From Swiss-Prot:
<protein>
    <recommendedName>
        <fullName>Large ribosomal subunit protein bL31B</fullName>
    </recommendedName>
</protein>
<dbReference type="GO" id="GO:0006412">
    <property type="term" value="P:translation"/>
</dbReference>
<keyword id="KW-0689">Ribosomal protein</keyword>
<dbReference type="InterPro" id="IPR002150">
    <property type="entry name" value="Ribosomal_bL31"/>
</dbReference>
<dbReference type="GO" id="GO:1990904">
    <property type="term" value="C:ribonucleoprotein complex"/>
</dbReference>
<dbReference type="InterPro" id="IPR027493">
    <property type="entry name" value="Ribosomal_bL31_B"/>
</dbReference>
<comment type="similarity">
    <text>Belongs to the bacterial ribosomal protein bL31 family. Type B subfamily.</text>
</comment>
<dbReference type="GO" id="GO:0003735">
    <property type="term" value="F:structural constituent of ribosome"/>
</dbReference>
<dbReference type="InterPro" id="IPR042105">
    <property type="entry name" value="Ribosomal_bL31_sf"/>
</dbReference>
<dbReference type="Pfam" id="PF01197">
    <property type="entry name" value="Ribosomal_L31"/>
</dbReference>
<dbReference type="GO" id="GO:0005840">
    <property type="term" value="C:ribosome"/>
</dbReference>
<comment type="subunit">
    <text>Part of the 50S ribosomal subunit.</text>
</comment>
<dbReference type="InterPro" id="IPR034704">
    <property type="entry name" value="Ribosomal_bL28/bL31-like_sf"/>
</dbReference>
<keyword id="KW-0687">Ribonucleoprotein</keyword>
Length: 80
């Protein structure tokens, strides 16, 4: 690999803005904000709008669109 062309890979904290859930992971994202976590270390902070803690698919609060109405309308329209 060429030296000096790759971004720095380091541990950062992603924080869900909705639920304020925080998790540490590796990333090359840059941030001016920092946060001190429970382990006593200071990490760059990256705020996200949606994470697995607030997304309806992962929380089980997802609403499924019912296709029954469309099927019933189709069958009624083309019923012989």
């Amino acid at each position: 690999m060429k030296q000096g062309i790759h971004p720095e890979y380091r541990k950062v904290v992603f924080m869900d803005s909705t639920t304020e859930f925080k998790f540490i992971t590796g990333s090359t994202r840059y941030s001016n904000e920092t946060i001190t976590m429970e382990d006593g270390n200071e990490y760059p902070l990256i705020r996200v709008d949606v994470s697995s803690d607030s997304h309806p698919f992962y929380t089980g609060r997802q609403k499924f669109a019912s296709a029954d109405g469309r099927i019933e309308r189709f069958n009624k329209k083309y019923q012989r």
